[in-house]
């Protein structure tokens, strides 16, 4: 069960998140497209920097968002409470995503029409929940975040989700996605944490405004196959599949989330 949420304004959430989030910015003045990266339930890890480097090499800025710093959730607490669903469900954490979208739109060096969200596991849950909720009362009730614009996801050009959790408590499988942008998902067939074939079925059935979610199936991939430092017995690092995923990330950013006619 989700504990009582602490209300905050968008400006308060932005300030809190930016204290411990990490920005990776290409050389030059821009304006640059940006990808907002949301970590898994274990917290911000080294793998996020490696993915951010891929984005930067493709000419994109990357903000590695830390959802735990301002909430004072330690690594132990994260595994004991967030990973088990006792606190910080995807719909609540979506407030961080909406706040960072607003932050990005305010930066003069960022292209406000080319913002991509990327999420790993719990971060994927967060991204898809954010894309499934209706602006106004539903979002405010879920996030307790106030002062959002009429369209909190204005400027969103795409979503890239890696082994996203879509089980009990996830809104997207029920609501479907509201925002019409390309969505790329990566699912491993040996993922015993969020599911392999079962997750593929959920994503393939998910209602979308137009094109279905593009689900890439990675044969033999476990959960967190891209984490070199993983110590979970359910996880096995696979360098070849990680390289494949990184290539897909760069291609998605440069192709699927291409410049709009308005930018």
Regions inferred by a protein language model and the residue ranges of each:
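Serine-hydrolase catalytic machinery in alpha/beta-hydrolase-like enzymes
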Residues: 10-25, 31-110, 125, 225-233
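Glycine-rich His-Gly loop
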Residues: 37-42, 164, 188-189
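Short alpha-helix in the alpha/beta-hydrolase fold that links the catalytic acid
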Residues: 50-51, 195-205
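Primarily recognizes the serine-hydrolase "nucleophile elbow" in alpha/beta-hydrolase
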Residues: 89-179
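Acidic catalytic loop of the alpha/beta-hydrolase fold
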Residues: 167-168, 190-194
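Short beta-strand/loop motif that positions the catalytic acidic residue
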Residues: 179, 185-187
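Acidic beta-to-alpha connecting loop that harbors the catalytic carboxylate
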Residues: 189-192, 220-222
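C-terminal catalytic histidine-bearing segment of alpha/beta-hydrolase fold enzymes
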Residues: 211-263
């Amino acid at each position: 069960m989700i504990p009582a949420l602490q209300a905050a304004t968008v400006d308060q959430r932005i300030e809190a998140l930016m204290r411990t989030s990490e920005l990776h910015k290409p050389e030059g003045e821009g304006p640059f497209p940006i990808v907002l990266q949301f970590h898994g339930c274990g917290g911000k890890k080294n793998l996020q920097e490696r993915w951010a480097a891929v984005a930067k090499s493709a000419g994109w800025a990357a903000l590695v968002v830390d959802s735990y710093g301002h909430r004072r959730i330690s690594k132990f607490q994260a595994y004991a409470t967030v990973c088990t669903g006792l606190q910080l469900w995807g719909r609540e954490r979506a407030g961080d995503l909406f706040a960072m979208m607003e932050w990005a739109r305010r930066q003069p060096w960022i292209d406000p029409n080319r913002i991509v969200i990327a999420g790993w596991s719990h971060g994927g849950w967060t991204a898809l929940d954010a894309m499934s909720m209706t602006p106004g009362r539903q979002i405010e009730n879920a996030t307790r975040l106030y002062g959002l614009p009429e369209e909190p996801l204005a400027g969103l050009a795409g979503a890239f989700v890696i082994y996203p959790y879509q089980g009990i408590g996830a809104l997207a499988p029920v609501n479907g996605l509201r925002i019409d942008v390309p969505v790329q998902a990566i699912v491993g067939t040996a993922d015993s944490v969020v599911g392999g074939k079962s997750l593929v079925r959920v994503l393939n059935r998910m209602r979308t405004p137009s094109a279905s979610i593009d689900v890439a199936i990675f044969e033999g991939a476990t959960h967190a196959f891209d984490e070199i430092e993983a110590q979970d017995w359910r996880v096995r690092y696979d360098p070849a599949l990680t390289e494949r995923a990184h290539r897909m990330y760069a291609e998605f950013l440069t192709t699927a989330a291409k410049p709009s006619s308005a930018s």
